[in-house]
Amino acid sequence: MGINFEVSRPKAGSDTNMSNTFHTIGLIGKPNHEGTNLTLKRLHHWLTMQGYSVLVEERVASDVGSHTHSVDLLEIGANCDLAIVVGGDGNMLGAARVLARFDIAVIGVNRGNLGFLTDLPPDTFEEALSKVLEGEFDTEQRFLLEAEVHRHGELKSSNTAVNEAVLHPGKIAHMIEFEVYIDDKFMYSQRADGMIVSTPTGSTAYSLSAGGAILTPNLEAMILVPMFPHTLSCRPIVVDACSIIKLVVSPHNGDNLEVSCDGHVNLSVLPGDEIIVKRSADTLRLIHPKGHNYFHVLRTKLGWGSKLF
């Protein structure tokens, strides 16, 4: 059901500092987190004083104040021009899986650890955010994955992932058997603890920890990374982003298998199931302050060496 906002758009000729780029801004954050709450309150006050219409995601609205417009994440996607996510990369991933289906720009304020997807500093966001709101920003289109579980020829469950879809055992780690097909062409059979199918966005996350290569965000590619394969010759492989990945689970496996999407959503998998992982039709419109340098982010977050000369 739609919502009617009395201050959703500025009147022509009104006295405001707003640019024509963004008018209605959604605030999303990590619930029950003291640092996030402080930043959300500052953001809400600052944006309101600038003349913007501000909507606050319902899980954090009460922490921001009783005077806020509280809405769910879908309403932020449908009604806002810009979403600001306060938290870590995990919070950004959760919001992005929903917001990617809408025509909305997304930017992050880092209240987490690494913060590959959250650029703005929590204590001094005003200067950088002011320039973004004036239209000075860089845009990246990040594609998502769609993971499907098929059983006896029928679709049983599905979900989307920004980072990765992972086939793995349930609560107890053990080796599983499965076959891997790329565009219906058999690639290999595998005995391993699982398989990671990652986007370029996810290549600095779980995939990296499992020995996968880093893919720059603009690459139209996916990377498949076996988890603890029972062979010395099996290595990660990069395939075209339009490829359709099929994992066929051996009927001899135990019944406690899952497919995890970004580590947040788990799809149950039974022996004999087929998992299809493909590019989603949804795309996340991630924006950064002007001059954003991906390699500077990598160097800073991963502790790479600085320039020697």
Curated annotation (Swiss-Prot):
It is an enzyme of class 2 (transferase). SUPFAM superfamilies: NAD kinase/diacylglycerol kinase-like. It catalyses: NAD(+) + ATP = ADP + NADP(+) + H(+). It holds the Pfam family NAD_kinase. NAD(+) binds at residues 89-90, 163-164, 174, 191, 193, 204-209. Keywords: ATP-binding, Cytoplasm, Kinase, NAD, NADP, Nucleotide-binding, Transferase. GO terms for cellular component: cytoplasm. NCBIfam families: PRK01231.1, PRK03378.1. This is NAD kinase. It comes from Shewanella piezotolerans (strain WP3 / JCM 13877). The gene is nadK.
